[in-house]
């Protein structure tokens, strides 16, 4: 099975995504990573993937928003309709639940069926998320 992980260019996010990729590849899943800088302005096709995950940071705690480059990356990704998905935000003190709802609404507007969601914290939590995602593929 193949998994596409769309993530922002934040160093903390990249570290968490690399740990998630390692954990998922140990279970035999092929994982491809895409970020706004690496993908340029070309459209990204989600057709060959069985699962699409989005990992991003957010700003604000009263009315959190996801990064603008992540929103543009989601809009440039094609063939998302009907795909299974996972939505994840970096763990924070306040607003992570609201930020997660905002991210899921952006994904659902593109047609993704969000089946798993959460906040990324430490290594143990990332390993547990990788196991859950492996069951979805």
Regions found by a protein language model. Name each.
Residues 3-36, 44-137:
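FMN-binding flavodoxin-like domain, especially the glycine-rich phosphate-binding loop
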């Amino acid at each position: 099975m193949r998994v596409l992980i769309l993530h922002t260019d934040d160093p903390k996010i990249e570290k968490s995504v690399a740990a998630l990729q390692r954990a998922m590849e140990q279970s035999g899943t092929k994982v491809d990573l895409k970020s706004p800088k690496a993908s340029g302005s070309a459209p990204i096709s989600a057709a060959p993937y069985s699962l699409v995950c989005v990992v991003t940071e957010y700003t604000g705690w009263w009315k959190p928003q996801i990064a603008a480059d992540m929103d543009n990356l989601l809009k440039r990704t094609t063939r998302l309709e009907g795909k299974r998905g996972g939505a994840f935000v970096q763990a924070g003190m306040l607003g992570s639940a609201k930020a997660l709802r905002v991210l899921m609404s952006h994904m659902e507007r593109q047609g993704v069926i969000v089946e798993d969601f959460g906040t990324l914290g430490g290594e143990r939590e990332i390993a547990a998320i990788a196991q859950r995602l492996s069951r979805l593929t």
